[in-house]
Every structure is written in C-alpha cells, then in structure tokens.
From Swiss-Prot:
Identification of the protein by name: Probable cytosol aminopeptidase
Places the protein is found: Cytoplasm
Family from the record: Belongs to the peptidase M17 family.
Single GO term (MF): metalloaminopeptidase activity
Catalysed conversion reaction: Release of an N-terminal amino acid, Xaa-|-Yaa-, in which Xaa is preferably Leu, but may be other amino acids including Pro although not Arg or Lys, and Yaa may be Pro. Amino acid amides and methyl esters are also readily hydrolyzed, but rates on arylamides are exceedingly low; Release of an N-terminal amino acid, preferentially leucine, but not glutamic or aspartic acids
Source species, domain of life: Bacteria
Keyword Manganese appears in the UniProt entry: yes
Keywords, comma-separated and alphabetical: Aminopeptidase, Cytoplasm, Hydrolase, Manganese, Metal-binding, Protease
InterPro entries xref list: Leucine_aapep/pepB (IPR011356), Macro_dom-like (IPR043472), Peptidase_M17_C (IPR000819), Peptidase_M17_leu_NH2_pept (IPR023042), Peptidase_M17_N (IPR008283)
EC number from the UniProt entry: 3.4.11.1, 3.4.11.10
Cofactor(s), by name: Mn(2+)
Organism ancestry: Bacteria, Pseudomonadati, Pseudomonadota, Betaproteobacteria, Burkholderiales
Source organism (scientific name): Burkholderia pseudomallei (strain K96243)
Length: 503
C-alpha cells in the first residue's frame, strides 16, 4: 500500500487546489452539533452545501465512529465523500481520533475504493500535529488489514482494494509527516512480524524457527547474527537456561542479532526477549484449559525481533543488540523438578521451587551475557507473570526499573507511541521473598506481589548496567473471539529507540 503526503492550507477555501485532485473518495470528519470548519467547510462550499444538507437531514449526527458515504459528488475531484463522526469537539482526544480513523478504514475496506484522500490528520487533536495523525492513521489501517491465514488450507479473501492513501497535512508539518509515514510503515511491518510469530503454533514456531527468522532479518537488512547451539550454550555455563531446555526434544537456541546505525564505539541498547516457544509449565504442569495460548510465551522474543526489523527499516542512528534465549518448557524424565538447584552463568545458584516460573531462568543467563556489550541500557521483554495481569489487566504493560531516568524514557515513549505502560515498585524489601535455605535464591517468592518478585529476581542479574523489565503477560495477545497476538510492545520499544536516536 502506498502512502503520500500533501501540504494543504484549508484557509484558502475553494481556491485550494487539493479539492480538484483525482481520488475515489475523500474522508472528512464532522463534529457533533458543531459548525463546519476546515476541510469539511471547504468541501461543503465546493459541493454547494451537500455536507450541510445531509447533516441537517439527520443522515449523520457527528457521533463518534458513525460513517456515511456520499456518492456521485460533483464540484470536487473525488467521486465519493466519506463523512466520519468525531463526537463532541470539546471532548476530542487522541483516543477519539484513533476511533474515528478506525471507523473510516473499516468503512473504506468494505468497498472497492482504490485511492483515498484522508483529511483527518489535520483535525485539532490536543498537543498533536498532523504528523502524529498520519502515523496513528497508518497504524490503524495496518491493524485493520492484518490477517493471519498462513495455517489455513484455504486462506481468507485476498488483499483489500485500497492501494493508495494521500494524507492532507498542515504545510508546516509536511516534512515531519513524511518521516512519520515512513516510520509508521516500518513499525507496522515489525508489528506484523511479531504477530505472525506469536500466532504460529508451537509445532511450527520452534526455537529453530525463531533462529531462522533472525537470520532472515539479518540477511534482508544487513545485520549481524550469531546463533549459539547447545554445545556453545554449555560452554558459556548457562546452567539456568539449559535446565529449562533439557526437558524438550527441541534444541535450545541463543540468538544474538546486532544492528549498527551509529558509530562503532557508541554503546548499544540491548533488548532481551523471552523465547519460550511453548510453555506447558514443565513438571509443575499448567491446567489443560487455555494451554494452547502458551504458544504466546515467546512474544517477548517476537517483539524484540519485530523491533529490530522496524529499526533496520527506519535506519535509526543508534546501535541495538537483540538477545533471545529460546527453548520449550516441557515435562520429561530429565526435566527440571521442584526443588532442583541449578547454577546460572553468573555463578548464583537457584532453587527451582516451581518449574512454571521458567522465563526468569532463561532470562537471567541472557542478562549476564548482555554485559559483554557494555550496554547503554538493557531492556528485557517477557510474558513473565500472570500476577501482572491481575495487577494491570490487559491495557498497561508492567514496567520495572530502579533507574528513574530509564523508566522515565520508557514511560514517555509509551505515551508517545500509544502503547501504555505502568511503573510498578522494585523495592529491595521484596528481595526477602526470594530467600532459599539451600541456594543463593529461589525462582519464586510466593503469591504476594508475584510480578514484583519476578522482576526482583531478574534485577539480581542486571546490576552492572541501566536496566528495565517489561512484563507483557497481559498485553502481548488477546483471548476470546479476537484471539491473536497484538504486536505489543513493538511501538513502545521502537519509539524509545527513535528518541534515543534523536530521529
């Protein structure tokens, strides 16, 4: 799909050349009980009051998300007009804009429209310019058009008819909007990869499949990749990671993918993604109901790989390293048992009180490995705890960090990207829950503050660099009728790196 930007000053009224541009449809926003303004006013004048008449007739009332097509329109270059309700102007917000854009795309995708002129990006969204509107609209469209049909014998209907979108923006925002469009496409491509990886079944998306995906990203975008196999992992003495992997016939992989967009000496940001391609719980077996969704336990890894793809396509001037420890967590005669004690790469011994708390066991060795890159910051991403879902539900990703500056950057990025996160505590007092009578620490700390103690466990292996942990257990996928991976937190991570790169 092709996206282009055109500066447009609606204050010029019907003299604006934008109105005569050929298009199958022009998208206009109308507020509830409000005098027409901007693009809607100009097109109303060009069509001799058509927009005003349909509003007066009650065909559309401007309520948020309502749509109405006007056909065989004369006086402008577009043959059709799509009116989109925006709700009350005094209540118009970023969310309302997103809802309006979504409604517009859904209406358009149900037609044979090929080329669209989209004017909503110039709407008065508080604290936002048209470049933000362009990015949000493209991401909304790509979300609407995403389909996962790879595993069906007869895939659903093909690509939508819509092929080209021209965004009108304020002339002063023209350059920024072009950058925003490019970044939005790259971001959507990264999110689609993340969603595809998450939606694939565990018998397809194995550790080897993730490794091959990383190799493809490296080949397509000129990145460096190293995939360490069993013997290399053993040589590194990653006993914690290997203790999880040994219960499965699928061989573990340790993926290191490097993007260099800045000077060689510039310290990289390291992203660590949990890659449990299927989590049965191990000997501490999960309940059978809903266990199919444990294919999503590699969404941390998927989001890190998706972010790397997006960053490479954007060409950001920043160095980034992705580390993905990946394996299955399965019950077997040689699998971890409750009470086993394993030795991590760092040398700390860990009492495995619950084999279903395996994510932290593979991440801790990856966090130790990350030290060799002398990172500017390390961010790990994991579907780590059900406790985080209890605390935050499915809206906010859980953010943990002792570094206030890094946490602030990530929260700012989450707000800018519309990919919300909420900071949770990481006080030293919680560490007491991880005490073991027989090892340096236990892998669980009991039911109270389960997401916090999981982060506390990881913090013991991330003491030598600025570090943050993102618990995406509640945000990486949806259940129910809309079951599927969300692509989060690729927008948050990408925006963080955009900000770091000064792009």
């Amino acid at each position: 799909m092709d996206f282009s930007i055109k500066g447009c000053d609606w204050s010029k009224g019907t003299a604006n050349g934008f109105l005569t541009g050929k298009s199958d449809c022009i998208v206009l926003g109308v507020f509830e009980a409000q005098t027409l303004s901007g693009a809607a006013l100009d097109i109303d004048e060009a069509t001799k009051g058509l927009v005003s008449r349909v509003i007066k007739a009650g065909d559309i009332d401007g309520k948020l998300g309502k749509t109405l097509f006007l056909h065989e329109v004369s006086g402008i270059g577009a043959s059709r007009v799509l009116l989109v309700g925006l709700g009350r102007q005094d209540a118009f917000s970023q969310k309302a804009y997103g809802d309006a854009a979504k409604a517009a795309w859904r209406a358009l995708l149900g037609t044979k429209v090929v080329q669209v002129t989209f004017t909503l990006a110039q709407l008065p969204v508080p604290e936002r310019a048209s470049d933000w509107g362009v990015r949000a609209a493209i991401l909304a469209l790509r979300n609407e058009t995403y389909k996962f049909t790879q595993m069906k014998s007869k895939p659903d209907a093909g690509a939508p008819a819509l092929k080209r979108v021209v965004f009108s923006v304020d002339p002063a925002d023209d350059k920024a909007a072009k950058v925003a469009a490019k970044q939005a496409v790259a971001l959507a491509n990264g999110m689609d990869l993340t969603r595809d990886l998450g939606n694939l079944p565990g018998n397809v998306c194995t550790p080897t499949y993730l490794a091959n995906t990383a190799k493809k990203i490296a080949k397509d975008w000129g990145l460096k990749v190293d995939v360490l196999g069993l013997k290399q992992i053993q040589a590194l003495k990653m006993g914690s990671f290997l203790s999880v992997a040994k219960g499965s016939v699928e061989p573990p992989q340790f993926i290191v993918l490097q993007y260099r967009g800045a000077a060689a000496k510039a310290a990289p940001v390291v992203l660590v993604g949990k890659g449990i391609t299927f989590d049965s719980g191990g000997i501490s077996l999960k309940p059978g109901e809903g266990m199919d969704e444990m294919k999503y336990d590699m969404c941390g890894a998927g989001s890190v790989l998706g972010t790397m793809r997006a960053v490479a396509e954007m060409g950001l001037k920043v160095n980034v390293v992705a580390i993905v420890p990946t394996c299955e967590n399965m019950p077997a005669g040689n699998a971890n048992k409750p009470g086993d004690i394993v030795t991590s790469m760092k040398g700390l011994t860990i009492e495995v009180l619950n084999t279903d708390a395996e994510g932290r066991l593979i991440l801790c060795d990856a966090l130790t490995y990350a030290e060799r890159f002398k990172p500017a910051a390390v961010i790990d991403v994991a579907t780590l705890t059900g406790a985080c879902i209890i605390a935050l539900g499915h809206h906010n990703t859980g953010l943990f960090s002792k570094d206030d500056a890094l946490a602030g950057e990530l929260l700012d990025a989450s707000r800018e990207a519309g990919d919300p996160a909420w900071r949770l505590p990481l006080d030293d007092e919680y560490q007491d829950q991880l005490k073991s009578n027989f090892a340096d620490l236990a892998n669980i700390g009991g039911r109270p503050a389960g997401s916090v103690t999981a982060a506390c466990f990881l913090s013991r292996f991330a003491e030598n660099y600025p570090w943050a942990h993102l618990d995406i257990a509640g945000t990486a996928w949806k259940s129910g009728a809309a079951k599927g991976a969300t692509g989060r937190p690729v927008p948050l991570l990408a925006q963080f790196l955009i900000d770091r790169a000064g792009a």
